[in-house]
Amino acid sequence: MSQSVESRTRIKSERYESGVIPYAKMGYWDADYVIKETDILALFRITPQPGVDPIEASAAIAGESSTATWTVVWTDLLTACDLYRAKAYRVDPVPNVADQYFAYIAYDIDLFEEGSIANLTASIIGNVFGFKAVKALRLEDMRMPVAYLKTFQGPATGLIVERERMDKFGRPFLGATVKPKLGLSGKNYGRVVYEGLKGGLDFLKDDENINSQPFMRWRERFLYSMEGVNKASAAAGEIKGHYLNVTAATMEDMYERAEFSKVVGSIICMIDLVIGYTAIQSMAIWARKNDMILHLHRAGNSTYSRQKNHGMNFRVICKWMRMAGVDHIHAGTVVGKLEGDPLMIKGFYNTLLAGETEINLPQGLFFAQNWASLRKVVPVASGGIHAGQMHQLLDYLGDDVVLQFGGGTIGHPDGIQAGATANRVALESMVMARNEGRDFVAEGPQILRDAAKTCGPLQTALDLWKDISFNYTSTDTADFVETPTANV
């Protein structure tokens, strides 16, 4: 049960006897707290400073992320303080790690503005990460109540509508990022788009840092890219697209670029995570109003999500971005060049795609989550993947994903079209083997070799990249498995 009236009265009396008292005694720790359905829950990994009790550290985090300051203030008496104080209610030691603890904290829903990621984050991650009582702090997971989720739009388009719009079913989407990401002229850029799409890809995309530089202004890029899309679509008889990056210095500039992308016929536009939560939500609202797919590149996330003891787990970003309303987000490959533990990435993908998730500690899911019918976000796998890994990608990531082969398309010795064809044939041969009931994971290399007998570009790709892998142990691994998993 929650604290009794007598207990609360005693605590209130005690806290006004002195200027500074421990957070736990101020009401920010309640081991008997009964969680409400409407509470927002957060799970922090805390590393207290030497000599700081983990319960006091947890209470301090609860206090500083809700109503507290460093000393008693009499104006607390003018508010419903017992309601508005966040409550740390559980502290568990992190398995097999000394001096780290998982702190569970509950926040009343009325502490947050409806439909605002900016307001949510101002409390949850706004000030507490610099707090001296903790040596390090990491936000691992959150649970959003249905009542709160219903105040958010969610993905502008969603997976189901995107498949219908693209007329692509029963397999992952195929894409590639234009390379080199910087330096091409508009005409050459458009040629890359055309070649990749004509060779069999569904999408080409801008990279995170191509905006409107002196070597190629944004209008030039948009026009040449869409010329490539239209010509390739006509030649292939398929619906195709190119992610036009509308990221810019101001919202006015982004709206202008997004409107132009719509005018020239694009079905999808792109933004970067670094534009900020308010800008992301604003663009998601625009995308839904204008019937556009919205792709989000997670540029900058590893500055705070990669280290295991401080920052924020990427699964939290996945949750916030599903609420904010993006349709795509880069979420890891497992086998590529970027950070990606298999169990962690499975948790990211489930967060983006599932209507409801249960507690799954090996995947880092600390709370059950009902997504209140918000649409699905399509995960994007990119960074160091190639055709020879197709069986692993299909096994780890499933069908509901965009597989993006940048260097694995444009680096093909026989040209961009050949690289795209190699990836398309590799994917379709693997999907066919799976649908026939074969053990496509164990037989994957042989399935690819058989397909390559009638596809020269695939054979060339397999020969070129057969020895390429990125076998590094991930820095962010599961806490609840015996042996940390690694890239394979």
From Swiss-Prot:
InterPro entries: RuBisCO (IPR033966), RuBisCo_large_chain_AS (IPR020878), RuBisCO_lsu_C (IPR000685), RuBisCO_lsu_C_sf (IPR036376), RuBisCO_lsu_fd_N (IPR017443), RuBisCO_lsu_N_sf (IPR036422), RuBisCO_lsuI (IPR020888)
Pfam families tied to this protein: RuBisCO_large, RuBisCO_large_N
Domain of life per record: Eukaryota
Entry-annotated residues carrying N6-carboxylysine: 205
Predominant localisation class: plastid
Cofactor: Mg(2+)
GO cellular component term of the entry, any: chloroplast
Annotated GO biological process: reductive pentose-phosphate cycle
Catalytic EC class: lyase
CDD domains named in the record: RuBisCO_large_I
Keywords in alphabetical order: Calvin cycle, Carbon dioxide fixation, Chloroplast, Lyase, Magnesium, Metal-binding, Monooxygenase, Oxidoreductase, Photorespiration, Photosynthesis, Plastid
Active site: 179, 297
Catalytic activity field: 2 (2R)-3-phosphoglycerate + 2 H(+) = D-ribulose 1,5-bisphosphate + CO2 + H2O; D-ribulose 1,5-bisphosphate + O2 = 2-phosphoglycolate + (2R)-3-phosphoglycerate + 2 H(+)
This protein's record includes keyword 4Fe-4S: no
Residue numbers marked as site, Transition state stabilizer: 337
E.C. numbers: 4.1.1.39
Protein function: RuBisCO catalyzes two reactions: the carboxylation of D-ribulose 1,5-bisphosphate, the primary event in carbon dioxide fixation, as well as the oxidative fragmentation of the pentose substrate in the photorespiration process. Both reactions occur simultaneously and in competition at the same active site.
Something else known: The basic functional RuBisCO is composed of a large chain homodimer in a 'head-to-tail' conformation. In form I RuBisCO this homodimer is arranged in a barrel-like tetramer with the small subunits forming a tetrameric 'cap' on each end of the 'barrel'.
Protein name: Ribulose bisphosphate carboxylase large chain
Gene field: rbcL
